[in-house]
């Protein structure tokens, strides 16, 4: 984007009617990137005008008319300017990429576009002029620019579109890239648990009364941990001399340290987990600056560290990457109440550092192929970041080996233009891309783009990065008509092939809708399981024909093939009286899938959707066995044990030899559930029993949790609060426990869970306004060393109002 203007006036005619008197001189001692700049200028001018300007390699300036590429020490690494020097055109820039970007920006000015790796637009011109009525010093809006889609990694595409990210295949010939080492989530690369934990558990998180490394973090107030982290970063600097930024960042889960020192620092920093983290990162950065003042230390403001600390400030050599992982992606952040909490954090971080980076999210990570209408948000929020002083953007999209994320090429190109110039007209850029790539089919494809975004503009149409959105009941038929029109308008097989690829998201959405499970009589399954499998195989063949290897983060197509093959229709066992109907699917983890309140005519359990990971084995009410409060549940194989009028018994064989039992019955207006964990083995096993349900909160914006604590304190508050994330969780124990009854009220629906205090050690509440609204209540037994023949028990009672 332009930075500085000084008046000049010159019109240089480089080519007229296919002829030119100009040659290109890359300078006396050009860098590899400046040699590439000369070659790219020569190639593209020839393609536009049929005039081939000679590239002259010379130690001193040749005679005659020249396009001179000049390295200027006084210009920044990516800054450049164009100017006239007599009859010469001078493209001057800093190193390593200034001159190269000066050439690409000039070609862009002449109408050259590099839309995708395969599609370039080169205008045909009989005359090529440069009108220099002013000298313009130019450079990018952000120092770090990375659209993180597989399609954006290509070296030529990335260089020509002036991005410089870590994952892009840029090398010395393109002026390199902004390289991290490692990229993120580096705590266990700094101090590998397999190396240190056995001898030094004090290096790792203190959680629930003991040191842990599984799904934990580092003890950030331990001075030896700081010393070892400094040594490791110095080793990285030696091993990766091309890297500029070194990541000292939390693991990708919770598990922060709860030791007295770390908690004391949290309290000093306003109760924020970011306090111990930033003090630790600053301590590492201070030592690194002494030996390597040109290197930067990076960390995250992410998840539990997203809120800024009260006192500590990032050092000048520290980059904070703020991650808006919980926001709505369909609306501009400044206009959406679901994103207000992030804007509060962004403003706060931007007040305490001028080195702020953003880790933005641009896809549905659970479903790379799902339509993801976020262009309104992008158009507003990339300029918004710039206004708030952000200096770098990582825009995380779909990144599997074979690419293929929804609108990946369009999104990458538009974002690259915004990252260079925040004043880019996104709407015009979308139209230009569609016309450039799809030609005569652009009009119906633009109509599809508008159809998709019209629904997203409605105030209640929130878009999240893991959930299945509501596209509206008529979206699929309208979309199919527009794609049919696009195919009819296409003039060649190559265009039709591109359109077919762009239609994959609509086909995938249809597949997910066909996967939806419902109760039909005494069965729980999709409407047509055989047809669903056939439809999946058809889509799978198309995906593979396009080289697409994955449609979910972390899972390949082989996983999906096994997943669809394993789908089944399940028997349903029901309990019913005048007040309630309870539907249970024993083979789905012994799960109660529906608790129907006949008076309210509502399911007291939350709705599930076919886009959820693990579907249909999700949601409902069930029981689990764990090693402790932090461990994941052990797998269990559930079966129906007994069903008779008014009572059902289920049994679950736990993978470690323990046994779960669930006894369900109706008593008036209550569902009574007794969950039992038994040890039939000959050895003691440390374990905890958990039981609970995913409840329907009604209107999530009105939903409240209400209970009286064991110490007598009354708790009654909304789940969704202004300037707070639209999701959350809380845990109570001791005198903070509910006194045997707690309730979720949500406008037209109310559900209570009753329990015995003598059986419960902890109670947990979690909630979300993302996707299918949910409020989950969980009860935990004490962690107990279960001897042979011993058991744990949790009894619950559920009722509506």
Regions found by a protein language model. Give the residues of each.
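Feature activates predominantly on carbohydrate-active enzymes
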Residues: 20, 32, 37-40, 44, ...
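Acidic-aromatic substrate-binding/catalytic surfaces of carbohydrate-active enzymes
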Residues: 35, 572-647
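Structured mid-domain segments that build the active-site/substrate or prosthetic-cofactor binding neighborhood
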Residues: 224-227, 235, 340-443, 447
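Extended, loop-rich substrate-binding clefts of extracytoplasmic carbohydrate-active enzymes
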Residues: 231, 296, 574-578, 621-673, ...
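Aromatic-lined carbohydrate-recognition surfaces of secreted/lumenal glycan-active proteins
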Residues: 281-307, 356-363, 393-398
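Catalytic domains of carbohydrate-active enzymes that cleave complex glycans
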Residues: 389, 415-570, 793-795
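Beta-strand-rich recognition/accessory modules
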Residues: 567-580, 587-589, 597-608, 647-655, ...
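Acidic (Asp/Glu-rich), glycine- and aromatic
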Residues: 589, 594-596, 658, 667-715
């Amino acid at each position: 984007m332009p930075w500085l203007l000084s008046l000049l006036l010159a019109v240089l005619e480089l080519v007229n009617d296919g002829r030119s008197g100009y040659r290109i001189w890359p300078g006396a001692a050009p860098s590899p990137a400046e040699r590439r700049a000369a070659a790219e200028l020569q190639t593209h001018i020839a393609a536009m005008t049929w005039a081939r300007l000679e590239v002259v390699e010379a130690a001193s300036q040749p005679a005659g008319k020249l396009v001179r590429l000049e390295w200027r020490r006084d210009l920044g690494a990516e800054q450049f300017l164009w100017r006239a020097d007599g009859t010469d055109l001078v493209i001057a820039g800093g190193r390593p990429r200034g001159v190269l970007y000066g050439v690409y920006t000039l070609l862009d000015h002449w109408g050259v576009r590099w839309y995708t790796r395969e599609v370039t637009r080169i205008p045909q011109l009989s005359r090529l002029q440069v009108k220099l009525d002013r000298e313009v010093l130019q450079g990018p809006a952000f120092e770090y620019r990375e659209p993180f889609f597989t399609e954006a990694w290509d070296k030529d595409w990335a260089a020509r579109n002036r991005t410089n990210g870590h994952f892009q295949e840029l090398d010395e010939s393109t002026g390199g890239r902004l390289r991290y080492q490692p990229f993120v989530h580096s705590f266990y690369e700094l101090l590998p648990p397999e190396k240190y934990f056995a001898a030094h558990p004090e290096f790792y998180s203190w959680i629930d009364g003991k040191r842990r490394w599984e799904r934990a973090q580092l003890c950030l107030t331990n001075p030896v941990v700081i010393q070892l982290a400094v040594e490791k970063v110095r080793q990285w600097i030696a091993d990766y001399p091309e890297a500029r930024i070194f990541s000292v960042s939390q693991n990708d889960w919770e598990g922060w340290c709860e030791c007295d020192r770390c908690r004391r620092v949290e309290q000093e920093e306003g109760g924020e987990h970011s306090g111990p983290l930033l003090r630790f990162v600053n301590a590492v950065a201070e030592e690194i600056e002494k030996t390597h003042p040109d290197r930067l230390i990076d960390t995250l403001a992410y998840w539990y560290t997203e809120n800024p600390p009260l006192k500590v400030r990032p050092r000048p050599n520290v980059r904070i990457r703020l991650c808006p992982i919980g926001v709505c992606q369909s609306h501009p952040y400044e206009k959406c109440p679901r994103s207000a909490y992030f804007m509060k954090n962004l403003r706060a971080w931007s007040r305490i550092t001028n080195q702020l980076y953003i880790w933005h999210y641009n896809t549905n990570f659970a479903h790379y192929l799902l339509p993801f209408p976020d262009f309104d948000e992008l158009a507003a929020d990339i300029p918004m970041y710039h206004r708030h002083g952000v200096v770098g953007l990582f825009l995380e999209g779909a990144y599997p080996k074979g690419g293929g994320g929804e609108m990946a090429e369009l999104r990458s190109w538009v974002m690259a233009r915004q990252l260079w110039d925040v004043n880019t007209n996104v709407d015009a850029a979308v139209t230009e891309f569609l016309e450039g790539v799809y030609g005569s089919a652009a009009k119906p494809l633009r109509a599809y783009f508008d159809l998709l975004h019209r629904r997203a503009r409605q105030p209640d149409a929130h878009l999240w990065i893991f959930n299945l959105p509501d596209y509206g009941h008529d979206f699929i038929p309208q979309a199919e008509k527009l794609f049919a029109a696009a195919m009819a308008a296409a003039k060649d097989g190559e265009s039709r092939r591109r359109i077919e690829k762009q239609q994959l998201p609509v086909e995938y959405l249809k597949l997910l809708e066909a996967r939806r499970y419902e109760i039909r009589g005494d069965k729980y399954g999709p409407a047509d399981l055989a047809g669903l499998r056939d439809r999946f195989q058809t889509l799978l063949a198309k995906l593979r024909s396009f080289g697409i290897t994955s449609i979910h983060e972390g899972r390949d197509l082989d996983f999906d093939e096994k997943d669809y093959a394993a789908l089944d229709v399940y028997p349903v066992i029901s309990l019913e009286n005048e007040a309630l109907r309870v539907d249970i699917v024993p083979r789905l983890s012994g799960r109660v899938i529906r608790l129907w309140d006949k008076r309210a005519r509502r399911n007291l359990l939350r709705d599930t959707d076919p886009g959820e990971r693990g579907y249909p084995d999700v949601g409902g009410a069930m029981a689990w066995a764990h090693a402790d409060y932090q461990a994941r549940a052990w797998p269990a194989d559930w079966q129906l044990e007994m069903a008779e009028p008014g009572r059902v018994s289920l049994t679950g064989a736990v993978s470690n030899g323990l046994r779960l039992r669930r006894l369900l019955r109706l008593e008036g207006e209550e569902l009574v559930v007794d969950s039992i964990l038994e040890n039939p083995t000959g050895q003691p096993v440390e374990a905890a029993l958990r039981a609970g349900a995913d409840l329907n909160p009604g209107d999530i914006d009105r939903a409240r949790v209400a209970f009286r604590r064991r110490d007598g304190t009354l708790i009654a508050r909304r789940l969704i609060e202004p300037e707070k994330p639209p999701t959350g969780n809380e845990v109570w124990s001791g005198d903070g426990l509910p006194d045997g009854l707690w309730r979720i009220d949500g406008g037209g629906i109310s559900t209570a869970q009753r329990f015995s205090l003598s059986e419960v050690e902890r109670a947990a509440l979690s909630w979300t306004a993302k996707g299918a609204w949910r409020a989950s209540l969980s009860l935990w037994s004490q962690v107990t060393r279960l001897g042979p023949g011993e058991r744990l028990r949790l009894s619950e009672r559920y009722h509506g109002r």
